[in-house]
A protein has these predicted regions:
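Extracytoplasmic
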Residues: 10-44
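Residue-level signature of mid-helix packing/kink "hotspots" within the transmembrane helices
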Residues: 27, 57-65, 115, 149-150
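Extracellular/periplasmic helix-loop-helix junction of adjacent transmembrane segments
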Residues: 32-62
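Interfacial helix-cap and linker-helix signal at transmembrane-aqueous boundaries
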Residues: 36-37, 70-71, 155-162
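Helix-breaking motifs and short loop linkers at transmembrane-helix boundaries and internal kinks
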Residues: 41, 75, 96-102, 129-130
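Conserved MFS/SLC helix-loop-helix module at the cytosolic interface between two early adjacent transmembrane helices
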Residues: 62-98
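Cytoplasmic helix-loop-helix junction between adjacent transmembrane helices
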Residues: 106-144
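Glycine-rich segments within core transmembrane alpha-helices of 12-TM secondary carriers
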Residues: 135-156, 160
Length: 162
C-alpha cells in the first residue's frame, strides 16, 4: 500500500485524526473550569486558572523549536505515536487528579507532549506529498486542528452540563 497513489492521503487522514485530538483535549479545559472547581477549589481563583492555562502555552511555545529538532533526529512516525500516547494518558490523569498541583504538573507535561506533534506531523506530510499536492495535504490536515478546537469546546460544555 505504501507505493499506491492513495497512501499519501491515508497518511493525511490518519494525521487529521491525531490533529483533531491534539487540539480537542487542550480546548476542553477552558470550558470545564466550573466543573473542575467543584473538586479542586484552587481553580475558583481566576489567577490560578490563568496559571494553569498559561503553563501549557508557555511550555508548548518554548518546546516547539526543540520539538522540531527532535523530529529531525528521530523516527517521526514513532514520535507522533509516543506523543499521542503521552497526551492521551495525561488527559486521563487530569480527569482523576485531586489537587491543583497535580493538574498544573499534568498540564505542563501535556504542553511538552503536544508540542512534539505538529513539527513531526507536518514534516511527515511533506515526505509523502510532492509540490503538486503538499499545500492541499497540509490544508486538509489543518482542518483537523480547527475541528478539534470546535469539538473540544462543545464537548466540554456538554460534559460540564452532566
Amino acid at each position: 500500500m505504501k507505493n499506491s497513489k492513495i497512501y499519501p492521503w491515508v497518511v493525511v487522514g490518519l494525521l487529521w485524526g491525531v490533529a483533531l485530538l491534539n487540539y480537542m483535549d487542550r480546548q476542553m479545559l477552558s470550558t470545564m473550569r466550573d466543573a473542575m472547581a467543584v473538586d479542586i477549589t484552587e481553580l475558583q481563583s481566576a489567577a490560578n486558572f490563568g496559571r494553569l492555562m498559561g503553563v501549557f502555552l508557555w511550555i508548548y511555545g518554548c518546546m516547539s523549536p526543540i520539538a522540531g529538532m527532535v523530529g529531525d533526529r528521530m523516527n517521526r512516525k514513532w514520535l507522533i505515536v509516543g506523543s499521542l500516547f503521552v497526551w492521551s494518558a495525561v488527559t486521563y490523569l487530569m480527569g482523576i487528579a485531586d489537587t491543583y498541583n497535580e493538574v498544573f504538573f499534568l498540564r505542563a507535561l501535556m504542553g511538552i507532549s503536544e508540542a512534539l506533534y505538529i513539527p513531526a506531523g507536518l514534516s511527515l506530510i511533506a515526505d509523502y506529498h510532492s509540490d503538486k499536492s503538499r499545500s492541499l495535504a497540509i490544508g486538509i490536515h489543518m482542518t483537523g486542528l480547527y475541528t478539534g478546537q470546535a469539538l473540544g469546546g462543545f464537548g466540554a460544555t456538554i460534559a460540564g452540563a452532566y
